[in-house]
Curated annotation (Swiss-Prot):
Key words, A-Z: DNA damage, DNA repair, Endonuclease, Hydrolase, Manganese, Metal-binding, Nuclease, Zinc
Catalyzed reactions: Endonucleolytic cleavage to 5'-phosphooligonucleotide end-products
Protein name (Swiss-Prot/TrEMBL): Endonuclease 4
GO terms (BP aspect): base-excision repair; DNA repair
GO MF annotations, alphabetized: 3'-5'-DNA exonuclease activity; deoxyribonuclease IV (phage-T4-induced) activity; DNA binding; DNA-(apurinic or apyrimidinic site) endonuclease activity; endonuclease activity; phosphatase activity; phosphoric diester hydrolase activity; zinc ion binding
Enzyme class, first EC level, given as a word: hydrolase
Positions annotated to bind Zn(2+) 3: 182, 229, 231
Binding sites annotated in the UniProt record for Zn(2+) 1: 69, 109, 145
InterPro entries documented for this protein: AP_endonuc_2 (IPR001719), AP_endonuc_F2_Zn_BS (IPR018246), Xyl_isomerase-like_sf (IPR036237), Xyl_isomerase-like_TIM-brl (IPR013022)
Length: 285
């Protein structure tokens, strides 16, 4: 079964994220559990936790259908010790918030070397950051998102994801989220079913589908291999509809949150309905 939704706003209270997801007939959703552009947030209150859990129960969202995202400020591969510790503390807090809310996944961007350390050293720091967070939490899986490779961001190669996983001690609590726009911008072609087959065969060999815990379904304003992260509405960008139809018809993508981060929230309900319909359409030639 496909879980299909969008990254919805939690403005006015975390419970509102579940309500907003239900309003667009989503069977999955993503959210920030705190302001994503601030380091600190007030601790979750018992009322906030209870209201969020009640809303999820009311609208039939289990933790398997929810893919929270951490703060954009966090860099788990930071080359400077003081800044690395600040990011690690913030990431632990994000993981603990998920644990309190009964959520089992936390999606994050791996990190950046800032041209100050090697890719290998940065990837090792990211893995160690995950190990520290896993040691201080229970029941939450750290879900590494692939990136477009802008600037010094790592995670734009499947090999980067594999290297991080290799350095994580508890393999049962690490996974990946593949963003289609990021993959395309990083040089993984998705424009035809044949290219999708090739890209995900590469993913299967390098990382493995057992680690796939979520996806971000985004078309791309950015061009192929540009290393630029610019999302677009489904079918409106340089990837096109075929990739998303192909994903909907492949059971390897069942049972994980498939999350829209497309640029027009006003048509999310239409995009979700279209994705759902593709599951029963005739397979792409």
């Amino acid at each position: 079964m496909k879980y299909i939704g969008a990254h919805v706003s939690a403005a006015g209270g975390l419970a509102n994220a579940a309500i907003r997801a239900a309003e667009i007939d989503a069977t999955a959703f993503a959210l920030f559990t705190k302001n994503q552009r601030q380091w600190r947030a007030a601790p979750l209150t018992t009322q906030t936790i209870d209201e969020f859990k009640a809303a999820c129960e009311k609208y039939h969202y289990t933790s398997a259908q929810i893919l929270p995202h951490d703060s954009y400020l966090i860099n788990l591969g930071h080359p400077v010790t003081e800044a690395l510790e600040k990011s690690r503390d913030a990431f632990i807090d994000e993981m603990q918030r998920c644990e309190q809310l009964g959520l089992s996944l936390l999606n994050f961007h791996p990190g950046s070397h800032l041209m100050q350390i090697s890719e290998e050293d940065c990837l090792a720091r990211i893995a160690e950051s995950i190990n520290i967070a896993l040691d201080k939490t229970q029941g939450v899986t750290a879900v590494i998102e692939n990136t477009a490779g802008q600037g010094s961001n790592l995670g734009f190669k499947f090999e980067h994801l594999a290297a991080i996983i290799d350095g994580v001690e508890d393999k049962s609590r690490v996974g990946v989220c593949i963003d289609t726009c990021h993959a395309f911008a990083a040089g993984y072609d998705l424009r035809t079913p044949a290219e999708c087959e090739k890209t995900f065969a590469d993913f299967a060999r390098t990382v493995g589908f057992k680690y796939l815990r979520g996806m971000h379904l985004n078309d791309a304003k950015s061009t192929f291999g540009s290393r630029v992260d610019r999302h677009h509405s489904l079918g409106e960008g340089n990837i096109g509809h075929d990739a998303f139809r192909w994903i909907m018809q492949d059971d390897r993508f069942d049972g994980i949150p498939l999350i829209l981060e497309t640029i027009n929230p006003d048509i999310w309900a239409e995009e979700i309905a279209w994705l759902k319909a593709q599951q029963t359409e005739k397979a792409v030639a």
